[in-house]
């Protein structure tokens, strides 16, 4: 386990070889994490990310972070620990003691390389300056970038004015189609009452022929 009183910059010095070997595969993710934490600026990130050699990229990154102070070194070690997919528990740099977490960036560590001033246009050592890139480009690049005439802003302003009504028309929401009310269901017709059955007529009584015969017999007698 590492020394709890050891500074993060001293830990980087002691474990520099292992850091360079281990962080090469995930150097891009490490750069992203350092930019998100504010350790690296945008130009520094672009300059380091443009280096094709991963080993050289990590070496430059360690030097650049050490020049920013102990707080930046502590952030680098923390990001490296989170970035490495399979950390080795025997590595001492993963057990750096707390003490620099909430501090602002300190002045450069003594005995380490200090980056040049921002006015020089160089973000990392060994990278070409902006003036050198312009010289390399030659007169062809300078001719390609022509100064803008004062008439161009007026044309652009007119074009933007002409586009404003179109933008307003596009921003207006389209009216929603009216939803037709659903027709109410028609009431079901009530069933007609069944007609009452008519009473059957009573059968007529047949005349009693026997009584007539008897009366006729009596008269004959």
From Swiss-Prot:
Tagged with keyword Ubl conjugation: yes
Determine the domain of life of the protein's source. Answer: Eukaryota
Q: Where is the lipid attached (N-myristoyl glycine)?
A: 2
Which residue stretches belong to region Disordered? 107-221
Which consequence is recorded for altering residue 69 to R? Failed to protect against extrinsic and intrinsic apoptotic pathways. Not interferes with DISC assembly. Promotes BAX activation
Q: Which residue ranges have biased composition labelled Acidic residues? A: 132-143, 165-201, 209-221
Biological process (GO) annotations held by this record are: blood vessel remodeling; cardiac muscle cell apoptotic process; cellular response to hydrogen peroxide; cellular response to hypoxia; intrinsic apoptotic signaling pathway; mRNA splice site recognition; myoblast differentiation; negative regulation of apoptotic process
Query: How does the UniProt record describe the way this protein sits in the membrane?
Result: Lipid-anchor
Keyword terms: Calcium, Cytoplasm, Lipoprotein, Membrane, Metal-binding, Mitochondrion, mRNA processing, Myristate, Phosphoprotein, Sarcoplasmic reticulum, Ubl conjugation
Q: Indicate yes or no for the key word Metal-binding.
A: yes
- So which tissues is this one expressed in? Highly expressed in skeletal muscle, heart and medulla.
- Region annotation (Essential for interaction with BAX) maps to 20-70
A Pfam family (short name) is CARD
Instruction: Tell me where in or outside the cell this protein is found.
Output: Cytoplasm; Mitochondrion; Sarcoplasmic reticulum; Membrane
Post-translational modifications reported in the UniProt record: Phosphorylation at Thr-149 is required for its antiapoptotic effect by blocking death-inducing signaling complex (DISC) activity through the control of interaction with CASP8. Phosphorylation at Thr-149 results in translocation to mitochondria and this translocation enables the binding to CASP8. Dephosphorylated at Thr-149 by calcineurin; doesn't inhibit the association between FADD and CASP8 and the consequent apoptosis. Polyubiquitinated by MDM2; promoting proteasomal-dependent degradation in response to apoptotic stimuli.
The recorded induction information for this protein reads: Increased by chronic hypoxia. Activated by FOXO3. Negatively regulated by TP53.
GO molecular-function annotation terms?
calcium ion binding; caspase binding; cysteine-type endopeptidase inhibitor activity; cysteine-type endopeptidase inhibitor activity involved in apoptotic process; death effector domain binding; death receptor binding; identical protein binding; kinase binding
Q: What is recorded about the domains?
A: CARD is critical for both extrinsic and intrinsic apoptotic pathways. CARD domain mediates a protective effect against myocardial ischemia/reperfusion, oxidative stress and TNF-induced necrosis. The C-terminal domain (amino acids 99 to 221) is involved in calcium binding and plays a protective role in calcium-mediated cell death.
Task performed by this protein: Apoptosis repressor that blocks multiple modes of cell death. Inhibits extrinsic apoptotic pathways through two different ways. Firstly by interacting with FAS and FADD upon FAS activation blocking death-inducing signaling complex (DISC) assembly. Secondly by interacting with CASP8 in a mitochondria localization- and phosphorylation-dependent manner, limiting the amount of soluble CASP8 available for DISC-mediated activation.
Q: What is this protein called?
A: Nucleolar protein 3
Native organism: Rattus norvegicus
This chain is encoded by the gene named Nol3
